[in-house]
């Protein structure tokens, strides 16, 4: 049993090993699911992870920097990168999934937003979400991905 600390609640329990798994399974798992669905694969045959707590000197225990590689036999591979210590966008997105193909790239940032570019970076299609969100609000269920998770959960209950 662990002593009560106010830093464990409400959202911050993710960063302590007794209750959470860090960013990899907090938000990372949602984007890896999108990758798996897009690649048409189920479970990885090999997983490698490197990372640690390099930037912040606080009581959180899980990595603030992490890279996980997933191998799906000879079918496909993908990687997930978590940089809680540095929010510099990758390909213009703070979070999301990217499929790099032979003729272009598909970026999915969540919340019904995606962008398709050709190999030269020319935008072929750019779809923006009509969802309003506050990036600093960690508890509001109307935030990007959470809204869809709640909708799915309620749909499952109704069935």
Predicted regions and their residues:
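Contiguous beta-strand/loop segments that form the cofactor/metal-binding neighborhood of enzyme cores
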Residues: 1-159
